[in-house]
Amino acid sequence: MKITDLTDSPKETKRFRVFLDNDKHYDFGLRNSKNGTYIDHKDKIKRENYRKRHYNMKREQPYIKNLIPSPALFSYYLLWGDSTSIHKNIQALNKMMHNNI
């Protein structure tokens, strides 16, 4: 599975929409978040706190750990990924998903 496109979400409360090569799409990220995300503020401490908090949520962990397409996965790796560039984070996640096949 591969991310093929990223656009602004048409949903009022979501920030982005990703499109996958299987014709599915997912809306994710809180629009107009007052605190922003790692791609906005570039604060590594906030990023680590977000990752720990969300990885330990029973509802989100299986999606993140097993690279299952979901809003939780895309927020974790694209908005709070290793890079402050969402496009670099897309490349990294695509590589991880390809290697996970």
Predicted regions and their residues:
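Arg/Lys-rich, low-complexity, intrinsically disordered basic segments
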Residues: M1-I101
